[in-house]
Amino acid sequence: MVGTTSSLDEIRKAQRADGPAGILAIGTANPANHVLQAEYPDYYFRITNSEHMTDLKEKFKRMCDKSTIRKRHMHLTEEFLKENPNMCAYMAPSLDARQDIVVVEVPKLGKEAAVKAIKEWGQPKSKITHVVFCTTSGVDMPGADYQLTKLLGLRPSVKRLMMYQQGCFAGGTVLRLAKDLAENNRGARVLVVCSEITAVTFRGPSDTHLDSLVGQALFSDGAAALIVGSDPDVSAGEKPIFEMVSAAQTILPDSDGAIDGHLREVGITFHLLKDVPGLISKNIEKSLDEAFKPLGISDWNSLFWIAHPGGPAILDDVEKKLGLKAEKMRATRHVLSEYGNMSSACVLFILDEMRRKSLDDGVATTGEGLEWGVLFGFGPGLTVETVVLHSVPV
């Protein structure tokens, strides 16, 4: 007989961690180049040779004013755009130029964030067992996960997973995957990286496609990295910042075509329907009920909140629907204001902002003094990721 049921059970148990997955370190990075939102309409219409479209420019100014964004970081500089006029047209073939940027710059920006996370973690990088890399910016083989592994000098046997073109919900997806990897592989330390560069979506204005213009007013560049692991080695200085208790993904009903993107010769084209905020706010309580019923929690103001800041209208509608106090979305709105919509990286930036503000304010936990929290990712599908978080004492 090759083996017994008891020995298989013992092997299975030995392979799995004892405790929940925790976020052990966070690092973020942005390109040095940044634009002030108040000045962006003038810059955008000038660089795209669209200043004759005066009515559309006024409309774009109003979009930027309503965005609640103060500044955004962007890899694309004025000099580069002048050298690549096809990227400034509304629908000119330009995929090669865009790909040449993101194939190099997405892993590089991801490395910047990863180096910071590894430094905070304080352990040798040889302890990293898994890499999960996510970007909506471009596609390549071997992927950005491979490039990052080389840039950081990780072990060639590190187990890699590459996620391309998932969109804004994917910050929640990488946490869900990292949780499963950490809890089902004893001793696993998962490096999670989300790196986004808008070079694939930047284009000039069109008065017949205003949804494209909305993206030009919101999207920005940034990368965030986490180290995720279960059973922290306290003797080595490991300590969780947040613990992940559960994670779920769902497709919202009647939401086909609400958000979608397509890779074309002109780059990635995005389409957003006006009822996206309504669709999310209408369905969010069901996701909350399912996530928090096992914990007996139904007071949404008792939670700390990390929500993907798709735009102020989504946050406003969610607040109104759930009766949330204004301070619940403080960390989310701060990241939207200072960085814009960085797609998948946003929720990881918000985690970082929340733990830093909690430390600065001297509250009891990393979750603004509260014990339980929720992280939401929203994106194409319309897909929603829901992660239940547990804070730790500061």
Swiss-Prot record:
Recorded catalytic reaction(s): these are: (E)-4-coumaroyl-CoA + 3 malonyl-CoA + 3 H(+) = 2',4,4',6'-tetrahydroxychalcone + 3 CO2 + 4 CoA
Extract the signal peptide range: none
Alphabetical list of Gene3D superfamilies matching this protein: 3.40.47.10
Q: Which GO terms describe its biological process?
A: flavonoid biosynthetic process; polyketide biosynthetic process
Task: Give its E.C. classification number.
Answer: 2.3.1.74
CDD domains to which the protein is assigned, alphabetical: CHS_like
Superkingdom of the source species: Eukaryota
Q: Which key words are in the record?
A: Acyltransferase, Flavonoid biosynthesis, Transferase
**UniProt GO molecular function:** naringenin-chalcone synthase activity
| Membrane-spanning intervals of the chain | none
Active site residues per record = 168
User: Which pathway, per its entry?
Assistant: Secondary metabolite biosynthesis; flavonoid biosynthesis
Q: Does the keyword Magnesium apply?
A: no
The record's similarity note reads: Belongs to the thiolase-like superfamily. Chalcone/stilbene synthases family.
Task: Describe its function.
Answer: The primary product of this enzyme is 4,2',4',6'-tetrahydroxychalcone (also termed naringenin-chalcone or chalcone) which can under specific conditions spontaneously isomerize into naringenin.
Specify the protein name: Chalcone synthase
